[in-house]
Amino acid sequence: MQFVRTVKKTPVTLLALSIGLALQAQAFSVLAQDADEPQTEQAAQAAQASSNDSGSLGTVTVTGYRASLEKAVDIKRSEAGIVDAIVAEDIADFPDLNLAESLQRIPGVSITREGGEGRNISVRGLGPQFTRVRINGMETISTTGGTDTSGGVNRGRGFDFNTFASELFSQLVVRKTSSADVPEGSLGATVDLRTARPFDFDGFTLAIGGQLGYSDLASETNPRGTFLISNTFADNKLGALLSVAYTDRTVLEEGSDTVRWSAASANGGFSPASTFAVPGTAYHPRIPRYNRYLHEQERLGVTASVQFRPSARTELVFDGLFSRFDANRWQDNINAVAFSASGATGKPGIIVRDGEVDSTGSLVYGVFDNVRIRSEGRYDEQTSEFDQWSWSLRHDFSDALRLNAFVGSAKSVYDNPVQTTVIADKLGVNGYSYDYRGDRRLPTLSYGNMNPSDPSGWTLAEIRLRPYKVTNEFDNVTLDLAWTASPYFTLKGGADYKDFDYQVQNWGRGTPGGNRVETVPAGLVSSAELAQLMRQYNISAGGAGTAVVPDVAAFARALGIHDGSGIFTVHSNLNNLAADNRQVNEEVKGYFVQGDFNFDVGSILVRGNVGVRRVETTLTSDGWSIIGGVPVATRVVNEYSDTLPSFNLAAEISPDVVLRLAAAEVMTRPDLGFLNPGASVSVAGSARTVTTGNPRLDPFRAKTLDLGVEWYFGDGGILSFGAFYKDIDSYIQTSRETRPYSTSGLPESLIAGTGATVNDEFTFQQPLNTPGGKLKGYEIAYQQPFTFLPGFWRDFGVQLNYTWVDSDIQYLSSTGAPTAKGPMIGLSKNAWNATLYYDNQKFSARVSAAHRSDYANQIPGRESTDMEGTAATTTVDASLSYNFNERFSISLEGLNLTDEWNDMWIDSGRDLPIAYTHTGRQYMLGFRYKF
């Protein structure tokens, strides 16, 4: 089946597409870079209607891949606000591993990866917590886990896109400006994801697709499959659809890490018997090591949809979505843990025999005696399960009055029932050395008189059991009316209600009423028995070679560590664990009124909207505070409200040029990790400290301004420029400050029995509202098919976009004092995407590159550094497809062809490595068939 573009003879066109398996893979990959989609279902219906009515209109027919690009251009032109989109009409034709991989093609969107695939997005320099995601019109959160260096479990408001198979979705919309009829919560963007529906297709549709993937680093093959069946009944008044997507994936990730760098004077300093003097201010790696992660992932997604349209005036839609993402992970490493520890087996016992301190004051080379070496084996079983259902109703009482109603519920559960780490130590190793001089990212590690592949001589040190669970639940109800007062003005108004629950639970070994315990009794296993419970692993990165690590599965069988009995019983109410167990409920009531306008001023067509949204939030946060070593239940209730005006205007000053202006006041609620009411109180003599979350935080609040100009030329060509500015009035940071307890808002019961009073001064470490700062930037996008060239060359085309963002945020030091301004966390100053494609009716090819510059992960950094960050990345993907006929096609795709490494660092002056890992290249050979 071919793409068909039907151009009505009107000033602004909505093009109709019929997207088939033969070409859609190519269409999606480029649409993702610079496409826009109407924000309303009515716009999508209008596009479908234009296709159905094309026989009665004067038309110009364009087939193939270019039709999809021209549709994207027309949609961008017709919108009042600033949006970009990816549109599909068949499940089997989504080319990227997941949704984040496709969204990164859109101007201003950058991604972070986990296990070699996209996990989170940032929009215009604003991180995942500033972007709201809706699925089929309903706000939701999806949560997965990750390695410790990549941030671990998502405990915040950010959306993890790797939960879902990309083939489940037919439309992705990134809305960069605000309007009153779109619920609040975003400083960056609102992303709408829509699954396929039966009326998207013409009658009976059955499509299947399959791929066989290969990961070159893991040397593993991985299957991937899709299935869709859809039909309409009762003279096209009723439709039903079912789709299924499945992926099995094995990825190997390996490289070096340091768990940060610290000063030589920390943890008691090196042994005074050292023969090489290390300055106390010199920085050294805390835990130098090579890591190996084996990710085994299985992803299943199912969507179901029923549409009932008894007349042109009424439509009822049911959407259901289920997804399960199983991600089991093995982590193996051998390391010099002594550099991060105190005591006789820690740094004070290490004798420095030789070393080199470079010009940045870093101990980049050293030879050491009496070093404690650690071998760690960790295994995680992780499941992210998501289910959602919703009903939506549209009814036109007349040509002038429309009702829209929506009710839905969604639940996301991340469950990590097995997080087990088995640790063995070997003491007194002499001649250990590390060398970062030749390669600062892939050092040379030598273990002196110890053979790292010898299983004998180890001592069992710890068995860590840390199950974890995060649950997010949303219930939504919305109702709104739209009255078309004239051809030039429509008045909208409505109300919505949202109930959101968030819960974190974690467990550990120990006795209720006591603390978490991770050590094991001496003699639990003998040295000989331990040797039988070790296994070998190999790391190719940096020539690390072979070493032994505790075999978690063997330990589980031998000791019953997962049986939940004896010393391996886990509890959630341990004194040093309970404060991290928490629950948050948000009850949100919203109201809006908005006017949509569309009129001519002389020869200029002016359209847009102006409105205001009022939102009232009631927050109830429950947790545990540790008082005198005993967990005490704590509850904090907070209420706040916001009035958010918005304005969007598009002026067509000529047939080919559109000017845009948008302004709004916006807000993002505090990240969920900040809202823990739990507090740990310590009173020791005159030292009084409180460590706590802060449920009384105000939201992030900002004023935004957008300006843009777009020039449309040729067949589907566009050159656009957009500038944006955000004045962030209220920001949130964690700080330390000293003030009376009475000013904290915490209950007096927390300090009962400590001897302190509410008038005493305490040192508080908690999140606080801070002044914020400014964010500004611009986007440039260029798209053009080369139809003006002769012969073979006319089938080529290009898409390019570039985004520049800058920010000045006032940060606080670890003592609460203001420091110099710095960039916003997660902000890449420069980002660009480029795609060169070739497309005709038989053959399609593309190569795409996505770049983001370095960005900060934490300001100030740990270990008394200025910041921590991630280095720039540039990923390159390519694909080929061949259409045998309108039903059957084959494809070949290559992802991360340059094998880009993930490079995290600490201290901007020293540029010291934290983690440096890669996952290799991936190739996929696939087919698509439509019956």
Which residues make up each language-model segment?
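Outer-membrane beta-barrel signature, preferentially recognizing the C-terminal barrel domain
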Residues: 378, 384-386, 580-586, 667-728, ...
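Gram-negative outer-membrane beta-barrel transporters
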Residues: 725-727, 744-859, 898
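Outer-membrane beta-barrel translocator/receptor signature
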Residues: 151-159, 167-174, 181-275, 286, ...
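N-terminal periplasmic "start-of-domain" segments of outer-membrane beta-barrel proteins
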Residues: 59-94, 120, 143, 147-152
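C-terminal beta-signal and adjacent terminal beta-strands/loops
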Residues: 727-729, 850-860, 881-931
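Structural signature of Gram-negative outer-membrane beta-barrels, strongest in the C-terminal barrel
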Residues: 307-311, 319, 396-400, 408-410, ...
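Extracytoplasmic beta-strand/coil segments of soluble accessory domains associated
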Residues: 100-147, 176
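Short loop/turn motifs that connect adjacent beta-strands in outer-membrane beta-barrel proteins
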Residues: 164, 182-183, 198-204, 234-238, ...
